[in-house]
Each structure stands twice: as structure tokens, then as C-alpha cells.
């Protein structure tokens, strides 16, 4: 309890030095989930797990009109998910955060519509081209102009995770003349691989398109992973479709294919195909959702 108080006071003191924030608002939100998983094989032990988290957040506005916010999430990993951001509708938003953050690339790694999670969710050893996000990363999101939104992220070098730094960029476009259509592209360069996955410099990219017509949404996405030594090269494609049967009930279907090309890396070097059928039903503040993967 004492350590928690010191962290909170330190963060507040830093904010007061940098900004003069008026009428900051504090909030505490929480959630809980109960999950049952079955991998279709003989299995001993309890299949049920529970997820839980509490988020402490504060926001306010500076004398210059900047909106400043900070949040800390308390969960099974204690207080490792944290973030701070500031910005406005004119300049966009600059953020800094811990392990709960996504890079500009990983934020759009799978944009396919679904009723509950991606087609590869829950698959043992799932192979996904999903960028790289680390602890203490900077991010930027621009205001939307003419349907175009730009985002970027920068992860400084870290001796514990990577020798070099990582940069990512993404852009999305929602044209006014085609209602319901969204297209996007993202790319990321890792100047050195993760200590636990990729072993050399890599470049990843993805492009996607989604179209919504009434209650129906369809999407397609293509991604690519290139490494300096060609030992970790891979390509993936994804397809998804979802349908809102009612305000409460949604159903979805998705597929994901991951293919390698001369890939010898143990973490990324196996071809994989997965499909999923999902559904979700919402009653007030409670949602019952499920997915069946193959």
C-alpha cells in the first residue's frame, strides 16, 4: 500500500511541474470475466479461469487547452499497465505507456470483424505478424482530416529486450464518398529482434480493408514479415465477416493463414491455418461470448 501511494504521488508531482491542470477528474473502473477453454483433447484440471482488473484514471485540461490524462491498471501483473497522454483536436495526441501499449503496427495487426476475438485466438502457438510493442513506448495519433488518420510509435533501445530501437507508422482512410468503407496500411522496423522471438532485424507491414453495409461487415487483410537474413520471412492473410442479428446478438466467422518462406526460426517458422466461428450476446452490462477455433 505504501509503495502504491508513493507511485501515485510521484506521478502527480511530475504533472504539476510540467502542467497546470484545472479540474482534474479521477475515476475508478473495473471489470471481471469468466472463461472456459476446451482444446478438444484429454485434459485434466480446471478449464475455468477468471480475468479481473481495476483501472485508476485521471484527466484534466491545462491553461493552454491541452487535455492531459493518466491511467494505471491493477491486475494479475500488478501495476505494469500504465499510460499518460496529452493533446487536443488540433495537434493530435502524444502518449507514453508501459506494457499495456500497442505500437502503431500491432494496434492494427488484425482488423477483421468478429463477434468475439480473432480467428487465431486460443490456437496453441498461434503464428501472427503483429508488430512489436515494448515497455515505455511513445506514440502519436493525429486528428482525422478528410477521413485520414495517421499514427506513429517509437520504442527506444532497451538492453533487456532489444539492442536497437523500433519505429512504426500507420494510416487509415475512411472516404466520405463510400460510406462504410475503411482501408489502412501500417509498417514497422525493428532494428534488433526481441530476445524471446525474432533473432535479427525485421520489417513488418500490413494492409486491410473493411466494409460495413447495414448490419453486415466484411474484411480482408494481408501482412508480410521480412528479416535481414531471410530466416524469418513469412506472409499471412485474414478474412472476416460479422453480422449483427439484433442490438444484443452478433455472430461472426473468420479465417487466418500464415505461410513461411525459408523460415528457420523456431518461434515463427511453421505454417498455420485457423478458422473460427464466434457469437456474443449482451444483456445490460453483461456479455456472454464464445469462439470455436479449428
Per-segment meaning from a language model:
Residues 1-294:
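Outer-membrane beta-barrel proteins
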